[in-house]
Amino acid sequence: MGKLSPCTGRSRPGGPGPQLPLLLLLLQLLLLLLSPARASGATQPPHVVFVLADDLGWNDLGFHGSVIRTPHLDALAAGGVVLDNYYVQPLCTPSRSQLLTGRYQIHLGLQHYLIMTCQPSCVPLDEKLLPQLLKEAGYATHMVGKWHLGMYRKECLPTRRGFDTYFGYLLGSEDYYTHEACAPIESLNGTRCALDLRDGEEPAKEYNNIYSTNIFTKRATTVIANHPPEKPLFLYLAFQSVHDPLQVPEEYMEPYGFIQDKHRRIYAGMVSLMDEAVGNVTKALKSHGLWNNTVFIFSTDNGGQTRSGGNNWPLRGRKGTLWEGGIRGTGFVASPLLKQKGVKSRELMHITDWLPTLVDLAGGSTNGTKPLDGFNMWKTISEGHPSPRVELLHNIDQDFFDGLPCPGKNMTPAKDDSFPLEHSAFNTSIHAGIRYKNWKLLTGHPGCGYWFPPPSQSNVSEIPPVGPPTKTLWLFDINQDPEERHDVSREHPHIVQNLLSRLQYYHEHSVPSHFPPLDPRCDPKSTGVWSPWM
């Protein structure tokens, strides 16, 4: 006699058949196999380690042909996917805010300059950040290093924005050894210097005279050592290197005695020390059993600062500009989970793309975010699929001022507030830039447009462009002219008009820039530590 079906109670001939618990188990296995995290080939969501360098130039790594020795980074890049058409923002705060929100700075109110020490400003508190989304997906989230996304209120701090732990500094730059940052205080008619180093939300006062890259590497490797491999990890390691001030232990400069320019020589040592630090982090991932299920990402936040040893040759411009030298990012992905390795990707990508890419890879959801400007790039990176991104807004800043003018210049060129009839879609006196496929349009004053050859390797320190200083519109075919030497706006007026129309669209859909006056209440005189003051 047949047995009773547990589902219906009816007689079923031919033996026992599958029971309900077994069916549920098979269904769970099927759902697991179809999840985004399984798409990488991992048995669980992958660990994500994101290393962000500060002010690292295009010509500052070995795999871009630099004389600076970076064997660990070179090896990781050679075994991974080099992002050769990858863009960041010209300055610290804009890149970091777009990395963690997946949204353009025109949608955050952060399109003008960066967050100053005493400004009552931070990434809007109603924005959901990458670590919050990864926590919801079951990740442990840790941050080490530079924040620079605002700290005037405790609600702005990393530990209030999704990170389980934080060790680092909150402002834009500081001394590598004393960990003190200096900023203007209006009531002093001068500057105040105070400690800017925290463990969680408490001041970390016991690290004086210890080089910051070494401190941050030690904390990162400790996080890795203490992390259970079965739980997914997100580690955001934002090095101080290689932002000024130019400081490094003497032994790291010794291999670069052939570099005559002192700034470049110190800078080279700083890059080499950072390269060694990256090697120590990847060594820790391997020795503690995490590497085989890790996606390791390396990126700069903006182009190199040529006034402080950095170099972007042969690209035009530098940090703070919309020229390629300011925004074309050095970056790569290394991971055993990549389906293609040892390749160079020419697919268009932007720093806003990391949030949707990593959240999807983690099996998480972006449903709680505001509309994203980033795209999921994992199949592009891992498998070589075409990029879903064809357009990229570099920025629109109608209040732009040139804080880093060309050598011998001391002001931003005067604006012409008229709307030339042939370019009526957008006011071309406004500082703006947009990319569509291979085309890049710039308007207004993009920043210093010189080319800067590597120091000590050329008879000239800079090469100025030829053309009127009042020029406010350029079009380049970046695929054919990555050095931005040939303006082709006159040859392609229809492309100019289309891109100006797109700039006007973005301009109309942007939020007002939030750049409040400095608040004298920020003064850390009473505590000696830069801290929230509101």
Swiss-Prot record:
Classification from the root reads: Eukaryota, Metazoa, Chordata, Craniata, Vertebrata
Q: What modifications follow translation?
A: The conversion to 3-oxoalanine (also known as C-formylglycine, FGly), of a serine or cysteine residue in prokaryotes and of a cysteine residue in eukaryotes, is critical for catalytic activity.
User: What gene does the UniProt entry assign to this protein?
Assistant: Arsb
Q: How is the cofactor bound?
A: Binds 1 Ca(2+) ion per subunit.
Output one GO MF annotation: N-acetylgalactosamine-4-sulfatase activity
Concerning its family, UniProt says: Belongs to the sulfatase family.
**Localized where?**
Lysosome; Cell surface
| General function of this protein | Removes sulfate groups from chondroitin-4-sulfate (C4S) and regulates its degradation. Involved in the regulation of cell adhesion, cell migration and invasion in colonic epithelium. In the central nervous system, is a regulator of neurite outgrowth and neuronal plasticity, acting through the control of sulfate glycosaminoglycans and neurocan levels.
Sequence positions bearing 3-oxoalanine (Cys): C92
Q: Organism, per UniProt?
A: Mus musculus (Mouse)
Family annotation (InterPro entries): Alkaline_phosphatase_core_sf, ARSB, Sulfatase_CS, Sulfatase_N
Report the glycosylation sites: N189, N280, N292, N367, N427, N459
Q: Report what the protein is called.
A: Arylsulfatase B
Entry EC no(s): 3.1.6.12
Q: Which cofactor does it need?
A: Ca(2+)
Activity regulation description: Inhibited by ethanol.
Give me the segments passing through the membrane.
none
The reaction(s) annotated as catalysed by this protein in its Swiss-Prot or TrEMBL entry are:
Hydrolysis of the 4-sulfate groups of the N-acetyl-D-galactosamine 4-sulfate units of chondroitin sulfate and dermatan sulfate
Residues annotated as the enzyme's active site? C92, H148
